[in-house]
């Protein structure tokens, strides 16, 4: 019987291992990937040597370092947001920043520590205390404060904490603005109250404005608090006083009581207003602004009431003398008869 045949196969070394995508990650090149991570989100950072763990923990104190596999594979788990109100609230564009030696930067530099802002920090009311104080100071940004006040009327946060912060803000604004509504933050508050256009907002506007001092009313609210002579004159016309009284047509609408504001809306008044926050021009640039009026008429304070205009024209027209016209007519007729 035949015996079995054995064949010796050639020996080969196993192929080298192929690194996975996770193994190719480098934590030192992932600053912009790690920073935006949400709460309880994992960010894989690849293999991490033991001697680098403390350095990574110091750079990212808001995260917990987690082992994910052999060979030192690791990940960072976000646990908190350490950004401060002054650094996060006084802008609407910042999600995080890097802090080093007491200075902050939007870009990472060696030795800097990450501090992140809470998501939707303005919507949750976490900025109200800081911005309320900052917007009354000397270094505030009017656009930021105006935007913050406006956003308060449209917050989506409906938690107990968020609602209580909003109530506290309204109460503080009402107290502050009742003393002096000319403060920039108060003028913004009145503007957004008017735009909110509810019965409660209208009542708050009128309450705040009625609390103003006599000097304030004399300076800013002469439309809402007219003189006796102006009131008596207004009885002569069917048109609302707000339509022809220059104190109304030229008034700051934020300082009008609701009834005056509504009456002004019934008028047909041409108004021109231009606001430029930032304008950059060079030698080739040109700028032209026009309201469709001549220079002499652009800032006219003549009342716009039509009846008054007609009366004004009649009063200043020449006086017709009928008896002189009659005599002149007879003289012309006599001359014609004699000439014939």
Curated annotation (Swiss-Prot):
Posttranslational modification: Unglycosylated because produced in viral factories instead of the classic ER -Golgi route.
Pfam families: Pox_G9-A16 (PF03003)
UniProt keyword Protease, yes or no: no
Predominant localisation class: virion
Entry's Gene Ontology cellular component terms: membrane; viral envelope; virion membrane
GO BP, sorted A to Z: fusion of virus membrane with host plasma membrane; symbiont entry into host cell
Keywords (A to Z) from UniProt: Fusion of virus membrane with host cell membrane, Fusion of virus membrane with host membrane, Late protein, Lipoprotein, Membrane, Myristate, Signal-anchor, Transmembrane, Transmembrane helix, Viral envelope protein, Viral penetration into host cytoplasm, Virion, Virus entry into host cell
InterPro entries assigned to the protein according to its UniProt record, in alphabetical order: Pox_virus_G9/A16
Segments for region (Disordered): 1-20
Coiled coil: none
Covalently lipidated residues, kind N-myristoyl glycine: 2
Protein topology in the membrane: Single-pass type II membrane protein
Cell location: Virion membrane
Induction comment from the UniProt entry of this chain: Expressed in the late phase of the viral replicative cycle.
Sequence ranges on the Virion surface membrane side: 2-319
Residues annotated as transmembrane: 320-340
Function: Component of the entry fusion complex (EFC), which consists of 11 proteins. During cell infection, this complex mediates entry of the virion core into the host cytoplasm by a two-step mechanism consisting of lipid mixing of the viral and cellular membranes and subsequent pore formation.
Similarity annotation: Belongs to the orthopoxvirus OPG086 family.
Quaternary assembly: Interacts with OPG143/A16. Component of the entry fusion complex (EFC) composed of OPG053/F9, OPG076/O3, OPG086/G3, OPG094/G9, OPG095/L1, OPG099/L5, OPG107/H2, OPG143/A16, OPG104/J5, OPG147/A21 and OPG155/A28. Except for OPG095/L1 and OPG053/F9, each of the EFC proteins is required for assembly or stability of the complex.
Identification of the protein by name: Entry-fusion complex protein OPG094
Organism: Vaccinia virus (strain Western Reserve)
Lineage, opening ranks: Viruses, Varidnaviria, Bamfordvirae, Nucleocytoviricota, Pokkesviricetes
């Amino acid at each position: 019987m035949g015996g079995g045949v054995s064949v010796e196969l050639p020996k080969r070394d196993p192929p080298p291992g192929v690194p996975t995508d996770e193994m190719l990650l480098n934590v030192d090149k992932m600053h912009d990937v790690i920073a935006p991570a949400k709460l309880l989100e994992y960010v894989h950072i690849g293999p991490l040597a033991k001697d680098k763990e403390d350095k990574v923990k110091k750079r990212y104190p808001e995260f917990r370092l987690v082992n994910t596999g052999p060979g030192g594979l690791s990940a960072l788990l976000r646990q908190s947001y350490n950004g401060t109100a002054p650094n996060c609230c006084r802008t609407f564009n910042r999600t995080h920043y890097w802090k080093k030696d007491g200075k902050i930067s939007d870009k990472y530099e060696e030795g800097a520590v990450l501090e992140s802002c809470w998501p939707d920090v303005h919507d949750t009311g976490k900025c109200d205390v800081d911005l309320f104080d900052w917007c009354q100071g000397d270094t505030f940004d009017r656009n930021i404060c105006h935007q913050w006040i406006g956003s308060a009327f449209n917050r989506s946060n409906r938690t107990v904490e968020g609602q209580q912060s909003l109530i506290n803000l309204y109460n503080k604004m009402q107290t502050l603005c009742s003393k002096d509504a000319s403060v920039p933050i108060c003028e913004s508050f009145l503007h957004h109250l008017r735009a909110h256009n509810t019965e409660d907002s209208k009542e708050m506007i009128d309450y705040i404005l009625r609390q103003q001092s006599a000097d304030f009313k004399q300076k800013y609210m002469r439309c809402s608090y007219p003189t006796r002579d102006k009131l008596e004159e207004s009885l002569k016309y069917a048109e609302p006083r707000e339509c022809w009284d220059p104190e109304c047509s030229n008034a700051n609408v934020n300082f009008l009581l609701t009834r005056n504001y509504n009456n002004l809306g019934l008028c047909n008044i041409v108004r021109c207003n231009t606001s430029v926050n930032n304008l950059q021009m060079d030698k080739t640039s040109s700028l032209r602004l026009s309201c469709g009026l001549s220079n002499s008429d652009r800032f006219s304070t003549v009342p716009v009431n039509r009846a008054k205009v007609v009366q004004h024209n009649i009063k200043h027209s020449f006086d017709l003398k009928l008896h002189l016209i009659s005599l002149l007519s007879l003289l012309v007729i006599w001359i014609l008869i004699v000439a014939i």
